[in-house]
Each structure stands twice: as C-alpha cells, then as structure tokens.
A protein has these predicted regions:
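Short S/T/G/P-rich N-terminal loop/turn motif that feeds into the first structured element of a domain
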Residues: 1-41, 47-57, 66, 70-96
Length: 96
C-alpha cells in the first residue's frame, strides 16, 4: 500500500541526517520526498504493508524531532481520485 507521511520538523538538521531510508527494512520503500527549502516540513510517499509497519519503523528514528501524520493513499498512473468519493456523471467530461 502507498502511505503519505506529513512531517512537521522541529530540528531539521537532526531529522534530515537521521532520515536515511537505506538503514530501514527492505520491506519499506521510499518513493518521493518533498521537503520545504528550510527543511521544517515535508511530505513523503512510502510503500509498505501497513501504516503501522511504517510508523513503527520511522517513529524511533525521527519521532523525537518531528510530528508525523500517516495516511493511506491511492495511486494509479500518478493520478487517482478517492475511491470512496462518488464521481458525478459530468466529472472529467469536456465541453466541446
């Protein structure tokens, strides 16, 4: 499953030096990291078996210097609509 992690980082130097995906289990895959220029916020996209699996791996490493929110997300061909939100019949239709 894909998991988005939203980080609010109190100590950017500590966080970014500790955040090395190569030291984690091969069961976890980091796809993208989107940090702000000052390093105090970031959004990362991971792939793992579950949110709990990822949380249990990351929190001991970065939890003391950041507040982290974890969300399961959907991704198909880089663009996805929420699967639980009904799509209107006209959504996505072009008016030509």
């Amino acid at each position: 499953m894909y998991i988005l992690v939203q980080h609010t980082i109190s100590e950017p130097a500590v966080f970014w030096n500790a955040a090395d995906p190569n030291t984690l289990s091969p069961q976890l895959k980091l796809h993208h990291t989107f940090p702000t220029p000052d390093g105090t916020h970031a959004v990362c996209i991971w792939e793992a078996d579950s949110v709990d699996t990822l949380r249990n791996a990351l929190e001991p490493v970065i939890g003391r210097v950041s507040t982290n929110e974890y969300f399961p997300v959907e991704n198909r061909e880089g663009f996805a609509r929420p699967s639980r939100v009904p799509q209107a019949a006209t959504a996505g239709a072009s008016s030509r």
